[in-house]
Amino acid sequence: MSGLIEKVSILRNDSIHVGYNMSSHIVDEILTKKASSTYVLITDSNIVKMGHLQTFVDEFNRLIPSKRPGSRILTYVVPPGEANKNRATKAAIEDYLLEKGCTRDTFILAIGGGVIGDMIGYVAATFMRGVRFVQIPTSLLAMVDSSIGGKTAIDTPLGKNFIGAFWQPDYVFVDVAFLETLPEREFINGMAEVVKTAAIWNEQEFSRLETYSKRFLKVIRDRRVDDSVDLTSLKEHIIKLVLESIKVKAEVVTLDEREGGLRNLLNFGHSIGHAIEAILTPQALHGECVSIGAVLEAELSRYLGILSPVAVSRLYKCFAAYGLPVSIADKLVQKRTNGKKCPVDVLLQKMAIDKKNDGSKKKVVLLSKIGKCYEPKASYVNDEDLRFVLTDEVLVKDFNSAPSTAVVVPPGSKSISNRALILAALGKGECKIKNLLHSDDTEHMLNAVAALKGADISFDDNGETVVVTGNGGNFTATDAEIYLGNAGTASRFLTSVASIVKPDSNTTHVILTGNARMQERPIGPLVDALRTNGSDIEYLNREGSLPLKIKSGNGLKGGRIELAATISSQYVSSVLMCAPYASEPVTLSLVGGKPISLLYVDMTIAMMKSFGIEVTKSTTEPYTYHVPQGHYVNPAEYVIESDASSATYPLAFAAMNGTQVTIPNIGSSSLQGDARFAVDVLKPMGCKVEQTATSTTVQGPTKGTLKPLPLVDMEPMTDAFLTASVVAAIANDTNQSTSIVGISNQRVKECNRIEAMITQLAKFGVRAKELEDGIEVFGIDYHHLKTPSDGVYTYDDHRVAMSLSLLAGLAESPVLIQERHCTGKTWPGWWDILHTTFNVELDGHEAVVETTTAKANEDKSIIVIGMRAAGKSTLSHVIAQTLKGFKVVDLDDVFVEKYGDIREFIKENSWELFREKEAMIAKEAFKNYSKNTVISTGGGIVETEASRKLLKQQMKDGHIVLHLHRDIEETVVFLSQDKTRPAYVDEINQVWERRKNLYKECSNYFFFSPHCQTEREFFTLKKTFSKFINRITGGAVPSIPNGRSAFVCLTYEDLAPVSSKLTRVTNGCDAVELRVDLLKQHDSHFISNQIGILRNQTSVPILFTIRTKSQGGRFPDDSYEDIERLLNLAIKLGVEYVDLELSLPESLLDSVASKRQFTKIIGSHHDFSGTVKWNNVEWENKYLLALKLNVDIIKFVGTATSLNDNWELEHFRSLHTDKPFIGINMGPLGKVSRVFNTILTPVTHKDLPSSAAPGQLTLKEINEYFGQFGGSSRKKFYIVGKPISHSKSPELHKTFYDEFGLSHTFDKFETDDAAKVFNDLVKGNDELGGCAVTIPLKIDMLKYVNELTDSAKSIGALNTIIPIGDGRFIGDNTDWIGIRDSLHQAGCEIAPESSVGLVVGGGGTSRAAVYALHQMGCSKIYMLNRTPSKLSEIKNHFPSNYNIHIVDSLDAIDEDDKLDAAVSTVPGDKPLDDQLISLLKKLLEKKRGHAVLLEAAYKPRETPIMALAFSRGWKVVPGSKMLVNQGIEQFYKWTGYQFSSHIDL
């Protein structure tokens, strides 16, 4: 068929050509019939990669010499994607055409998908006031939609396709061969337009599409190695579906070229679909959104009484059959869009700017049936009806407008429908089933029968009739799980069917599964009965419930089968229907008490007779049935009567509102027990009931006069008890209630319906109580019904929803009913009946939608999970210290309090019982400690489904569930030495392998904690972890530097061997870039370990970068899944920055960006070629994309081939100021750009093995160059005080300057006169960078500064003066930082509320020591001085909560106190007072654990107090440490550089 060209006429020209492998035809046709001096081929880079452009170029080059000598061809390639369909790209194309001298005879070929077709068509429409062009669509969507009809456009930031023109192409060449290289998802995406077009215009083609869906998906999913597909077996179908779709659009366009009305019909599904797309783009594709929109617009048609429920069901199933989503809630849509919400108000706003609208009036294309629209144009619709269709909650308003009479035909009986499908599939021959219920339940049954190859299924009468051609009971196993949702009937019937399934060559079993509720519902008695009769059935999860694994080939032995049927009659019907296919006749005996719902068993027996098998009841044994062997013979036609359970709702409506309702096709001859509802329930309550053999009419009494029923046994119609309950709720008699019995089976339906009804009636102010096998309802006057404040919860149960909707319209104000879509199980159109037949006003409602913007954690509790020995207990306390006011609750400790020692409990009981109790404790703790608590859990909490559900619910409720982990080998070593905890049953590595994915799914943050070998490493880790906690809780969101800053680019393949270098390498940088692509491994564990090593060594913010090959890195360009996995891991690890390459697919970019939480996103783009100059449109397009993604920082890197490239970059920078911008050029000529870049310049370091990019400089080099260029001024710094001759400060700060290439100076200014310092050094000195203040001026200088930091105010002394401009100065105190960091680095542990500190001395530094110890968490501080009176002044200076105790005698020391930290601030070179030594010795003897003493004096190297402390087991820290640490803080305050390297003075 490759040589056959089909031509379609549009606007009276045969200009649409459809065929296969048409390149030669296309070029020959153009050259023969369209003369031009210049043929311009325009496409995108994706089409170039596939070789399509070159094919056309070669063909032109072959034919031009003979066909058009003297003509030329030009090619232009644009970047792919919707982001490039804009004014800038259009202008660049036009500039190119002008530069090449193109004139009005230019002929353009637009080769590509919809983006290319739309944009290049618009170029053709406007270039030289319009030139000729052809559309050569390469995607299915473009072939059947955008290429046809002459619509051309570009996008703007305010919306898609807002600027464009109608400009008809000379040709549209549709070469179906292009589809061989179309990715699967794009193929399926295009099918949305195909199905939509058939739905509005061509029912015959729609029916054909329905039959081809399975073949279609099978072929397009069978991919070659290069991801292409062989369409040979499907070629005719593909060409036909393309042709038929094109013919419809061509006909419509011919009749209405400029969209006067008829052409609106092509927008079926687009009014709502475009609104959804505007929110979910780019993760959701156009066709996917149109599919969802079409289903919703069809539901709108049904809601308005225009379209039949069967037609909606067909449309729904057809879209779904082609792999398209049919709901925003679709799991794949949710996954792809990261759960992005589509708020109804936003959708309506988006719909308000639809081009079809008339001003503010919205218009939607409505269907009247498959293949025909309601009007020859879009129809007006109101927001109320749209709001209803778009939401899953409904506000039911009053019933005051109810008609006096109504006729309602409920959908087919669910019970009969499911039985008829099973019997027809078991039978032989064709059976036309009419009035089948089209619902979720029957859909699951149809799918299951088809999956097991039990029958061929087709549709007649526009889908109203289901044609089942049974295979005589020959079912075949399938390797795919059969998912049954919450369809209890289907699950029970199919369990017996699965027992008679035959194996195929690949599969020897059938797996039946369902949703979470289905996996709780009972099926045990049926399984027991089948097992005893030879079936091999295995429970895969919970004993007694789905999922089941049923071995094929065993069949049923037959003979006597005993079955307990007190819970469900469906067990009985299931066995009965399959019994004829047993190896011998079956005698089925029901045991264990009176069976439930025997009328349904009678129904089954009657239906079996209709299909040729007669069951006889035993005359000697009760509840026993004899089933002969045989085969069902299908009747030619079987009509399903309407569902009697569903009929109870409109009949009850009449009863409760005093109106008349007739059900025309259910009467006394019905097979269904619920048909007796009107006679047995409503009539005794005061209704007039007329029932014939085939119809039922109810006339309700005057509203409010219903009578209660003292006792009614509803065992024959248990499902109808909910309807009876709501009628009883307004049967008002203070002396009488209504008791309904015989309904105990309703406790194990979709929910516990008895409990549900009691709970929900209470919301209306109606009291009800539970009976042993029923419910008692105490009715009230309907005028006194309350409006449920939080609405009616339906438990996802169709019968709860429909029954309570009857009560809702009688309440005093509108009632909210949640999860209204659950009625789709049996009556999808129930709300339509309320609205159109009963004239009830309904309004859609939506709960407040949480935004995706990251929210601060505030007081929400944090749950910590992870393996044993991961550091949960230790780090939980760090969390509590970080988040002031939080406490720690360890669930292992709670367990011990309740049940005793864990090891003993497991030994005496079992691991299973331990896990059960653990889950109960967790549930209780999550409820009782929901605020201000860190909840540390046991390592195995993720082992059980119950606990996992709890953890996932915590995440849904906005809590942080933090997974802590450390290197597993270190864990093995630690646990092998720990004898206090129960031994693992399995090896630790095996436990980790089993749990690691469970931890992943149950946590929203992850922290990897490598082994700390030194106290400094542990200090750094705790500091970093504290910052991590502050960040993920929103307490300290990383701020983007607003001045000169840099990040160092690591180029190691593994950080472990070089970890000791990391502190030095990151010195002075504002961030450190982990180049993930350069690492030797890319698994999550290795990457997490690398992050952990970084956090062990430095607290510098981390930039996580995956640089792909095309962007100058090593990561494979097309490994999108791995890229997304690792980027998501980075966000879960809470890194400060993530680099997102703007060349990645837009859907991936948007997905990652939407999950950012508190991580900052850097949108980057690199050009290594040097050919993309700074005036190239590519930079502009990438910048617009970055803005659209709302990245936090934009990073563009070009390549300089001349110095002028740097000045072009600066010009680009000056014009693009919307976001912080990193802009540099690579290469030797681009070095100057690195000097002039301000924010986060990438730098290298001399200790790195290589630089990350050509021309990269060190931080020192950049500062030196910047200073030489005059970019920074030289500042003068001083230390002031007396004596300072031996001060180490000048040496310290000069070390800093040298490290960072700064030209500043640091000198001594010795004086004890504060006024002299101010007048001679500070006042009017523009060169002053700052002053370090030492004794005796720390207090005296306070009056010479304009402001004080909080610490300086609290301490009452300063040691740092910082100029802030305009002759103003801030006073700060960094001594306390020096003290705090020195103690921390030495491993000093301070436990809030229990730690005790000591300060020796009474000078200015002692104040800083008091402040430091208090900030660290000391609850009591002792002070000791040779002159105790001086200490009173200090004590009085600080607030009382500092809890300062002056030690002037031994009596002042509490015997119970243990000291954790001490600071000596007395001069180190002066003798100590005997009294002081005596008291100090006593205090030093009262140490706790690893107590640390810091000596503030750094001369001499070892002071007497250090010696005293050391001799008593204290760890002592020399004063030089404090000097360095406070100096580092001073240097940071003055220059903005954080010095992190080790310094010895």
From Swiss-Prot:
7-phospho-2-dehydro-3-deoxy-D-arabino-heptonate binds at residues 129, 145, 151, 161, 193-196, 249, 263-267, 270, 286, 355. Pfam families: DHQ_synthase, DHQS_C, DHquinase_I, EPSP_synthase, Shikimate_dh_N, SKI. Pathway: Metabolic intermediate biosynthesis; chorismate biosynthesis; chorismate from D-erythrose 4-phosphate and phosphoenolpyruvate: step 2/7; Metabolic intermediate biosynthesis; chorismate biosynthesis; chorismate from D-erythrose 4-phosphate and phosphoenolpyruvate: step 3/7; Metabolic intermediate biosynthesis; chorismate biosynthesis; chorismate from D-erythrose 4-phosphate and phosphoenolpyruvate: step 4/7; Metabolic intermediate biosynthesis; chorismate biosynthesis; chorismate from D-erythrose 4-phosphate and phosphoenolpyruvate: step 5/7. Its cofactor is Zn(2+). The active site is at residues 259, 274, 822, 1166, 1195. It catalyses: 7-phospho-2-dehydro-3-deoxy-D-arabino-heptonate = 3-dehydroquinate + phosphate; 3-dehydroquinate = 3-dehydroshikimate + H2O; shikimate + NADP(+) = 3-dehydroshikimate + NADPH + H(+); shikimate + ATP = 3-phosphoshikimate + ADP + H(+). Residues 859-1049 are annotated as: Shikimate kinase. It is found in: Cytoplasm. Binds 2 Zn(2+) ions per subunit. Residues 396-840 are annotated as: EPSP synthase. One of its GO terms (molecular function) is 3-phosphoshikimate 1-carboxyvinyltransferase activity. Residues 1-383 are annotated as: 3-dehydroquinate synthase. GO terms for cellular component: cytoplasm. Keywords: Amino-acid biosynthesis, Aromatic amino acid biosynthesis, ATP-binding, Cytoplasm, Kinase, Lyase, Metal-binding, Multifunctional enzyme, NADP, Nucleotide-binding, Oxidoreductase, Transferase, Zinc. Its main location: cytoplasm. NAD(+) binds at residues 44-46, 82-85, 113-115, 118, 138-139, 160, 178-181, 189. Its EC number is 4.2.3.4, 2.5.1.19, 2.7.1.71, 4.2.1.10. One of its GO terms (biological process) is aromatic amino acid family biosynthetic process. In the N-terminal section; belongs to the sugar phosphate cyclases superfamily. Dehydroquinate synthase family. In the 2nd section; belongs to the EPSP synthase family. The AROM polypeptide catalyzes 5 consecutive enzymatic reactions in prechorismate polyaromatic amino acid biosynthesis. This is Pentafunctional AROM polypeptide. It comes from Komagataella phaffii (strain GS115 / ATCC 20864) (Yeast). The lineage of its organism: Eukaryota, Fungi, Dikarya, Ascomycota, Saccharomycotina.
